[in-house]
């Protein structure tokens, strides 16, 4: 099983002024159980715009995905933003 959950295509408007040296990245989140152990994992793919197929894909166990979620939650709090649900 593979299923796309969400993706975010890069937009020039996403960059703050003065961030000329920042990579233009798009990301996608999916789930997959196409492994020898058949355990479902969360797949996070990050690709530089214009380099389709050359991105990095992380295959996260549920515990690893929760740790990433917590890190994003904490980062949002650090910059004074509500972390959401």
Show where each model-derived region lies.
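Positively charged, low-complexity terminal tracts
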Residues: 1-85
């Amino acid at each position: 099983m593979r299923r796309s959950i969400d993706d975010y295509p890069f937009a020039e408007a996403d960059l703050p002024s003065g961030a000329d040296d920042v990579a233009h990245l798009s990301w996608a989140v999916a789930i997959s159980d196409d492994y020898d152990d058949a355990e479902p994992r969360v797949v996070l793919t990050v690709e530089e715009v214009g380099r389709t197929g050359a991105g990095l894909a992380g295959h996260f166990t549920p515990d690893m995905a929760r740790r990433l979620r917590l890190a994003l939650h904490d980062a949002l709090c650090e910059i004074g933003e509500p972390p959401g649900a």
